[in-house]
């Protein structure tokens, strides 16, 4: 193979000019045309018997284009291997204006290479390690949430109070005129839950079924409905029904409803503590991991390949559209989401992927089989039949990619925590559970 010069363009972009001998192009084109001749069905000739000259007239140009494309791809691969180029993404090929060599056809390949990743001094980085505990108070709090999730509403003949569910008819007017979305019949909501504007809810409190009254409501300037934002409306409200909230007792029936077959309340609390502890651990680990990843990004000066960032942005856009479809938005598949809104996240992901790959390779942080098994077991623990979930993961090797990635990340986090300046941060239960999962 002739020597090829790799030209450095901007940042990670490189350029090589590939030279394809016309003798090779013509030989490959002739071979392709003969293959076409054997398959061709042309009027006036038996199948495969049309003259090669006619086949060349009909298919010669497209055959030559196919051959050039194949040779370009093959030649670029050979050059990349010979020059030990770590190509990121796919190259683009452009014609070369100066075709000064009549013996060959020249094509320019423009591509990006992976950046050299140099891990900086991790001991200079600060990392926040988050901690939290789950005790009786947190179990009590969770049980109370579970009770509220199973609230029953029973009809009562009294004035409406906060926490009651009410059913109302209402009609609103601004300057004496009805407005879009300002009226409804048999509308149900829970007082004090913040479903309606505070002035509206306050007007309903104290009413009895069958009563009607006018309530003045001032829409905030930042109200989501632009047509009414900042305006004052008068609502005529009729209360149809009042229902009082009743929470279930924490007894055997309640425990059974939560999956404790024998209704043992103590077992139920143990199960709640185990589940909540697992979720708290997951969340604090996520926050610690986020801090570690931020430290790695600070420790490494890195320019992510544009091609990989664009690919990741497109993947994130498709992922969002699929999530919309899964939520019932059938038309979301056709959404034209601008990739720019995903670029920052995509660049972060690509950069971290390159940094982690280097860190894992340099420090032998690949997970053991036992570590991957532990991640899978942790996934399965919250399901009714954990073994069924474990068997599902191991039935198809590709399914182990996610738990393997998590095991790698866990090893990276432990490694960085052992090198960096670690500041422990204890969070309350509410702070942890209020954090984004």
Swiss-Prot record:
SUPFAM superfamilies found in the cross-reference section: FKBP-like, Triger factor/SurA peptide-binding domain-like, Trigger factor ribosome-binding domain
Organism for this UniProt entry: Neisseria meningitidis serogroup C / serotype 2a (strain ATCC 700532 / DSM 15464 / FAM18)
Stated name of the protein: Trigger factor
Gene that encodes the chain: tig
Domain notes: Consists of 3 domains; the N-terminus binds the ribosome, the middle domain has PPIase activity, while the C-terminus has intrinsic chaperone activity on its own.
Coiled-coil regions listed in the entry: none
Major site of localization recorded for this protein: cytoplasm
Higher taxonomy: Bacteria, Pseudomonadati, Pseudomonadota, Betaproteobacteria, Neisseriales
PANTHER family recorded: TRIGGER FACTOR CHAPERONE AND PEPTIDYL-PROLYL CIS/TRANS ISOMERASE, TRIGGER FACTOR-LIKE PROTEIN TIG, CHLOROPLASTIC
Catalysis performed (reactions): [protein]-peptidylproline (omega=180) = [protein]-peptidylproline (omega=0)
GO molecular function (one): ribosome binding
Highest taxon in the source lineage: Bacteria
Function statement: Involved in protein export. Acts as a chaperone by maintaining the newly synthesized protein in an open conformation. Functions as a peptidyl-prolyl cis-trans isomerase.
Pfam families: FKBP_C, Trigger_C, Trigger_N
